[in-house]
């Protein structure tokens, strides 16, 4: 019984010296961060695409993917702004299974979170410095935010965390775009309350001190579908649901309204191939309705080198968590989006 210490106290400033961005790399990241902020504020009309593996389990495969994605970003940069998913901590429904690079930097060995922190920073650093892309990650543990805040450009608050007050309050101190998912129940009021709390100033105890925040006006919505009590799936990217969501967005009076459609999870019913159809249908809905076009300006897509998923890391570039689109389909889909816009 109880919580038992496994390591000495973590020195955040010492951790930040690992894989630290400097010089031209820091300047390039800052420039892309400003572009991303303009996209969220509606000052840049490019479509936001947050795309990449469900979980970043293999550094070589993730970098391989990142180099391919970087070349494609250059090709479509006039209409699409890409942020790569480099998700390093994974929520587990029942607490079991692979929990991400943060927990297990080597999938063949036992959890090692201290080395996991170093591995996470190293991976984000390599993607940024070797490809010129900037990265997205889920803030699964609110206490870990300071460990990566200088590297991650887009933060996501997951479906299981969006109701949590500490996640909301910590997110209110983030000065980068922060997407907040609807909860697994599909209750959009919960999500909008989360965005409201995140956009406002907050006071709370964080780590070992009383803190206050300035509020995060770049917090926005991610629609990921819902899971029913009977284990079914309820998508929330349909035309009529989007109109209701937009109406609720307006009623809350939030700053910088912006909706990202998560094409996997409960929207796809875990059928990764459905992501292609969901993107196509959403683009049609944007063309059909000006309000949808104004609000729905981003996609979150799970994609890797190989189609599908596997239980253990045997096939290079194939997900060991949720199934993903392979690179061929990913490349074709991004080009299709670019041509359609």
Model-derived features: where do they sit?
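Short acidic, Gly/Ser-rich segments with clustered Asp/Glu that frequently serve as metal-coordination loops
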Residues: 54-57, 256, 264-270
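Conserved, mostly hydrophobic/aromatic
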Residues: 52, 261, 326
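Internal helix-turn-beta structural module
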Residues: 303-341
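Active-site-facing alpha/beta catalytic cores
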Residues: 7, 66, 79-244, 248, ...
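N- or domain-start disorder-to-order transition segments that initiate the globular core
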Residues: 1-41
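Glycine-rich phosphate/diphosphate-binding loops that line cofactor/substrate pockets in enzymes
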Residues: 37-45, 251-256
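Conserved phosphate/anionic-ligand binding catalytic regions in large, soluble enzymes, centered on
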Residues: 48-61, 322
């Amino acid at each position: 019984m109880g919580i038992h210490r496994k390591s000495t106290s973590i020195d955040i400033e010492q951790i930040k010296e690992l894989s630290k961005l400097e010089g031209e790399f820091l300047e390039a990241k800052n420039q892309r961060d400003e572009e991303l902020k303009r996209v969220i504020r509606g000052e840049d009309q490019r479509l936001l695409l947050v795309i990449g593996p469900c979980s970043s389990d293999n550094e070589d495969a993730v970098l391989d993917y990142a180099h391919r994605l970087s070349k494609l970003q250059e090709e479509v940069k006039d209409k699409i702004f890409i942020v790569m998913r480099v998700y390093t901590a994974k929520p587990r429904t029942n607490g079991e299974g692979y929990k991400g690079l943060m927990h297990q930097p080597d999938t063949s060995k036992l959890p090692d979170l201290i080395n996991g922190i170093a591995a996470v920073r190293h991976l984000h650093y390599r993607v940024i410095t070797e490809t010129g892309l900037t990265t997205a990650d889920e803030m699964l543990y609110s206490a870990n935010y300071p460990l990566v805040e200088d590297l991650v450009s887009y933060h996501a608050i997951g479906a299981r965390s969006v109701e949590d007050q500490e996640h909301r309050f910590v997110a209110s101190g983030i000065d980068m775009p922060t997407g907040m998912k609807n909860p697994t129940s599909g209750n959009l009021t919960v999500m909008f309350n989360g965005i409201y709390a995140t956009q406002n100033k907050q006071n709370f105890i964080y780590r070992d001190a009383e803190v206050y925040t300035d509020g995060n006006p770049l917090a926005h919505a991610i629609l990921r579908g819902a899971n029913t009590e009977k284990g079914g799936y309820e998508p929330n990217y349909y035309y009529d649901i989007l109109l209701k969501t937009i109406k609720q967005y307006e009623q809350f009076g939030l700053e910088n309204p912006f909706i990202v459609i998560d094409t996997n999870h409960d929207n796809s019913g875990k059928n990764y191939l459905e992501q292609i159809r969901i993107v196509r249908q959403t683009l049609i809905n944007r063309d059909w309705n000006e309000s949808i076009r104004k609000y729905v300006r981003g996609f979150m897509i799970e994609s890797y080198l190989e189609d599908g998923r596997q239980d253990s890391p045997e096939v290079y570039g194939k997900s060991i968590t949720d199934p993903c689109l392979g690179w061929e389909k990913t490349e074709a889909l991004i080009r299709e989006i670019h041509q359609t816009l």
